[in-house]
Amino acid sequence: FGPFEAVLLHLIQILKPHTEIIWIDNGYNTHATYKFADKLCEQLKLNLKVYTPTMTARRRDARMGGIPEVDTELHLQFTKQVKIEPFKKALKEIQPEVWLTAIRRVQTVQRAGTDIVSADKNGLLKVAPVLNMTDADMIAYLETNNLPNELDYYDPTKVYANRECGLHNRD
């Protein structure tokens, strides 16, 4: 439920209402993100399935001393705990045929070279319908369709805007 996520969620609801929407609630979302998620779920009537890490954020913070520095082994463990493991659990339970993702070329160097349709490392078909959209395109879509946006978003697995979150390069 980060910036511009409403675009993909709206497209999904138009094309295939009642699609199961996976949200990995890592426990580090801002208050605004939770309010945005509630508002968008109500507005779009989303069939939301929430997956969380096994360990709470508070307990993990106590063990790891807070969110670990990026590019360290501890941060890799952190990412696996808060994002990869809940995502794997979601895939195992839901067993989707397709993973629709809101990644866009303008977001990171890795995403700039991504194909709209690909298979991930585990063979799951991954489709990025908004891959070629710019920020201006996304804003125009939000405005045209009277959709909210969430800019007070923080992803502790990325930390910096130009890093990957772990899902698109998971084991």
Regions found by a protein language model. Name each.
Residues 1-171:
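Nucleotide-activated chemistry modules centered on ATP-dependent adenylation/adenylyltransferase
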